[in-house]
């Protein structure tokens, strides 16, 4: 229990006070408007108040907040209160945008200090989505089970404020945040991300959710470290039996008042944890009994510490050899590659069967075709159709749009073990482009291709920059070059998941 408290205090030692006065500084709102600290915010676009963001409005808002001594809502008129007046929607968005910038400043400074010096290049590479897959290639082939858990959303807004309270001691800022949440956020729409983004500032919403998740992960990391600080002894079978009784005394018991149960943690150095959006993934070399214990650890952690109701059905356990993990636009699984080795010893020969475990990454072709169908590039069966909304654009713009989408998908799915599915996606986009151009010129596809020839669509099949570099190093007919073309390539410049993949 004492170690647990010390661990949390060390993680929260870098607290920053007195953030509230920054709300009355005009340059904070200028930063929010100009996205000065928003370069990494690539999933959402702040809309709805950009054209209303002017210096006089900010000054009136600051003066009105400065003159007001306390935040009191009018019980008679919910649309007008003594703090924000008539334009409460505009003012609330401005305060939310400014508060998002303010609370991000301490964390941004820590990120900048971490990424300086020799760690700059590594930190840049770690920001890539593809950086996780080389790690999976090295680790997943040695693991047995994978546990997928859906992180429950907070059922009450106060949970988000309490999570931020551990990091920010400024009570005034927290009171202002609490007031804004309760005054301008509908509880049901706030829980649903798609609706809440249109009402509340998406940047602040994402920050609050990440701070809540960070608090949960910090506790889980403590439990994981407690369960794996004792490494297995590298020795023979009989020596392991000797050391076994010495290991028993190190099996620790972690107890916390809110859990109501004692958590017995077994030592396992082969636990790997990944969080992707609202899903936690835990891969382990444990037996089915121990991985089931981790399943109930998740449920107890959410229920008794964070007061989040989570059913055990939201946590799934699967065996890696029989299951494909849907993760970041890939279906990842462990595949056995059998190989037969012939050994000759004097006059006797032997056949040795050897199976090697490798990570198999495939494209989820069905879901990707479904995304292309929603975007009106093909029908539900994968047959290309024209894009009528683009038919009014110039031919060069139409071709450029299709080529850009095709190259982005090829770039993102370059790590696929099988390229056949990728070629099918490129085929759909190519003939969707042809049908769109034929529709624009009021012609059939056959007549259009016969008139202009198929050479004008060569951009779909031109070499990528990487293939061009390989062609300069190796001869065109060299076997190693063909092997490189078929191999997996992971890029460390991909920091955003493709829109078509994300909506699949």
Curated annotation (Swiss-Prot):
Cellular compartments per GO CC: chloroplast
Domain of life: Eukaryota
Main localization of the protein described in the UniProt heading: plastid
InterPro entries the UniProt entry points to: Domain_X, Maturase_MatK, Maturase_MatK_N
Pfam families: Intron_maturas2, MatK_N
Recorded GO MF terms: RNA binding
A biological process from GO: RNA splicing
Keywords, alphabetical: Chloroplast, mRNA processing, Plastid, RNA-binding, tRNA processing
Cell location: Plastid, Chloroplast
UniProt similarity note: Belongs to the intron maturase 2 family. MatK subfamily.
Function: Usually encoded in the trnK tRNA gene intron. Probably assists in splicing its own and other chloroplast group II introns.
Name by which UniProt lists this protein: Maturase K
Gene: matK
């Amino acid at each position: 229990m004492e170690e647990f408290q010390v661990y949390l205090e060390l993680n929260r030692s870098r607290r920053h006070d007195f953030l509230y006065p920054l709300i009355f500084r005009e340059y904070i709102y200028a930063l929010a408007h100009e996205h000065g600290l928003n370069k990494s915010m690539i999933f959402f676009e702040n809309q709805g108040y950009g054209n209303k963001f002017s210096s006089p409005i900010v000054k009136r808002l600051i003066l009105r907040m400065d003159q007001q001594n306390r935040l009191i809502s009018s019980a008679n008129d919910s649309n007008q209160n003594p703090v924000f007046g008539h334009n409460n929607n505009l003012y609330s968005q401005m305060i939310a945008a400014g508060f998002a910038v303010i609370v991000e400043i301490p964390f941004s400074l820590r990120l900048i200090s971490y990424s300086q010096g020799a760690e700059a290049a590594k930190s840049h590479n770690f920001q890539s989505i593809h950086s996780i897959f080389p790690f999976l290639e090295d680790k997943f082939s040695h693991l047995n089970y994978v546990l997928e858990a859906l992180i429950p959303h907070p059922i009450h807004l106060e949970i988000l404020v309490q999570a931020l309270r551990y990091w920010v001691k400024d009570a005034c800022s927290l009171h202002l945040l609490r007031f804004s949440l309760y005054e301008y956020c509908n509880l049901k729409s706030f829980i649903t991300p798609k609706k809440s983004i249109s009402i509340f500032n998406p940047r602040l919403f994402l920050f609050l959710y990440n701070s809540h998740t960070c608090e949960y992960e910090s506790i889980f990391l403590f439990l994981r470290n407690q369960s794996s600080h004792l490494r297995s002894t590298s020795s023979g079978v009989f020596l392991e039996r000797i050391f076994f009784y010495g290991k028993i005394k190190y099996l620790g018991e972690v107890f916390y008042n809110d859990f109501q149960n004692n958590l017995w943690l077994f030592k396992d150095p082969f636990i790997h944890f990944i969080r992707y959006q609202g899903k936690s993934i835990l891969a382990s070399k444990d037996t089915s009994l121990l991985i089931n214990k981790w399943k109930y650890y998740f449920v107890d952690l959410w229920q008794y510490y964070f007061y989040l109701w989570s059913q055990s059905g939201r946590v799934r356990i699967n065996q890696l050899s029989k299951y494909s993990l849907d993760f970041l636009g890939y279906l990842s699984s462990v595949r056995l590659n059998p190989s037969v080795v012939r050994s000759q010893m004097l006059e006797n020969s032997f056949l040795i069967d050897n199976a090697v475990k490798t990570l198999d990454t495939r494209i989820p072709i069905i879901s990707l075709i479904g995304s292309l169908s929603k975007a009106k590039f093909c029908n539900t069966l994968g047959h290309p159709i024209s894009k009528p909304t683009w038919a009014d654009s110039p031919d060069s713009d139409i071709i450029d749009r299709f080529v850009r989408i095709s190259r982005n998908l090829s770039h993102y799915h370059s790590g696929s073990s099988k390229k056949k599915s990728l070629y099918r996606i490129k085929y759909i986009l190519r003939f969707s482009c042809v049908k769109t151009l034929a529709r624009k010129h009021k012609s059939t596809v056959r007549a259009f291709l016969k008139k202009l020839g198929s050479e004008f669509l060569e951009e779909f099949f031109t070499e990528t920059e990487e293939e061009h570099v390989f062609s300069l190093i190796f001869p065109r007919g060299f076997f190693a070059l063909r092997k490189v073309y078929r191999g997996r390539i992971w890029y460390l410049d991909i920091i955003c998941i493709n829109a078509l993949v994300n909506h699949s």
